[in-house]
């Protein structure tokens, strides 16, 4: 069934789940911008539903396919049936796992066109000849391909996955009305249990190894004697390392300086309590947390991974470094936190950049053209 002047274009997202995370947040933000404005947005979760399903514009249009461990032919059949039932005009998969199911359910994109998105750098297990060939072959079945930053697009190209120049960069956007500079930073700190003069370094994300929380915990231990007001604010929950990381926080020699806020739906109240956001992950495509912090005029110390490097100017709007170990991270934190005036100046410039280049309106326009182009092709 094709979209017409009288019927919106129907898009079905295929995800592992809608559990809280950066990828999922991007899907929700895009869906909320497009649904009811020329588009009808649905979602199918392979394994389970997830809390972010309730943030979708119509939670009733989120289904679970009941994928078992390993490859699940039953999930393919259920996805194929759901595609027919919804009358979807195109299917939007996210990262390799969901693309496998999208390709199988649509007979290689022949019954319904596939739009596919990549959201993070390839990991060692993705770089084997077999995995690279698998991605290359599956990419050929897609009507449109996109990556969430130009740096990620170039990263995929460097690994031979974009020989035809087909991958488009579709940067994430941030709601700059929701995420804004704190009217009262001291009050924001107090609400989370900090003192007004505490130096608060935050980290936001699921409790998984790829976010590299442990590196930040080690850096705190190294800096504890030098910076008596240094505190950590850890925002996020869930993930494969949740229990281990919670135990590590509780057993940390400086446990009294760590506030674990868990999963929060009011992140706009968390960033203003921070003097600096740490983003030591090495795999970010374009981190939602980085953009949200910048919109709140909070400067970011980030690993020079592909997406971060195009968002942060290391001399004006934040701090970029090769954060390969705790000693390096501690050195960068020491330098950044040692000049509060410079932190404020870089935070203000960070917000200006977000307003200029990473608006929700710009993101919406990217996806409108991506979807319309896929149907026209």
Which residues fall in each region the model found?
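A short helix/loop element that forms part of the nucleotide-sugar donor recognition site in Leloir-type
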Residues: 180-194, 247, 347, 366
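Short hydrophobic beta-strand element within catalytic cores of glycosyltransferases
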Residues: 45, 299-302, 312
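Aromatic "clamp/platform" in nucleotide-sugar-dependent glycosyltransferases that forms part
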Residues: 263, 282
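Conserved acidic donor-binding segment of nucleotide-sugar-dependent glycosyltransferases
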Residues: 313-315, 319-326, 335-341
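Short His-centered aromatic/hydrophobic patch
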Residues: 93-99, 118
């Amino acid at each position: 069934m094709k979209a017409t002047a009288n019927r919106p274009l129907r898009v079905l997202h295929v995800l592992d789940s809608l559990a809280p995370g950066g990828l999922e947040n991007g899907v929700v933000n895009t869906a909320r911008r497009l649904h009811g404005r020329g588009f009808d947005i649905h979602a199918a979760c392979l394994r389970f539903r997830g809390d972010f399903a309730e943030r979708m514009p119509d939670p009733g249009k989120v289904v679970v396919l009941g994928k078992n461990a390993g490859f699940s032919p039953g999930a393919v059949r259920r996805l194929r049936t759901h595609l027919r039932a919804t009358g979807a005009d195109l299917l939007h998969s996210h990262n390799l796992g969901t693309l496998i199911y999208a390709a199988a359910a649509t007979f290689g994109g022949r019954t319904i066109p596939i739009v596919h998105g990549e959201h993070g750098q390839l990991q060692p297990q993705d770089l084997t000849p077999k995995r690279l060939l698998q991605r290359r072959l599956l990419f050929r079945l897609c009507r449109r391909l996109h990556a969430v930053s130009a740096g990620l697009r170039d990263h995929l190209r460097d690994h031979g996955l974009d020989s035809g120049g087909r991958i488009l960069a579709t940067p994430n956007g941030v709601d700059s009305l929701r995420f804004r500079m704190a009217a009262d930073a001291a009050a924001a700190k107090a609400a989370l249990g900090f003192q007004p003069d505490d130096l608060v370094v935050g980290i936001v994300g699921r409790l998984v190894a790829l976010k590299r929380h442990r590196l930040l915990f080690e850096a705190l231990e190294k800096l504890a004697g030098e910076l008596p007001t240094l505190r950590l604010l850890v925002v996020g929950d869930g993930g494969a390392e949740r229990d281990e990381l919670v135990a590590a926080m509780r057993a940390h020699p400086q446990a009294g300086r760590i506030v674990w806020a868990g999963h929060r739906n009011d992140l706009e109240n968390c960033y203003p309590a921070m003097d600096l956001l740490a983003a030591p992950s090495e795999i970010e495509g374009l981190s939602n947390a980085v953009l949200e912090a910048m919109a709140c005029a909070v400067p970011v110390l980030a690993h020079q991974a592909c997406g971060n490097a195009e968002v942060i100017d290391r001399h004006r709007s934040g701090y970029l470094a090769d954060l390969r170990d705790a000693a390096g991270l501690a050195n960068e934190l020491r330098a950044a936190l040692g000049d509060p005036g410079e932190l404020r100046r870089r935070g203000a410039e960070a917000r200006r950049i977000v307003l200029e280049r990473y608006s929700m309106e710009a993101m919406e326009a990217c996806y409108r053209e991506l979807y319309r182009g896929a149907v026209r092709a």
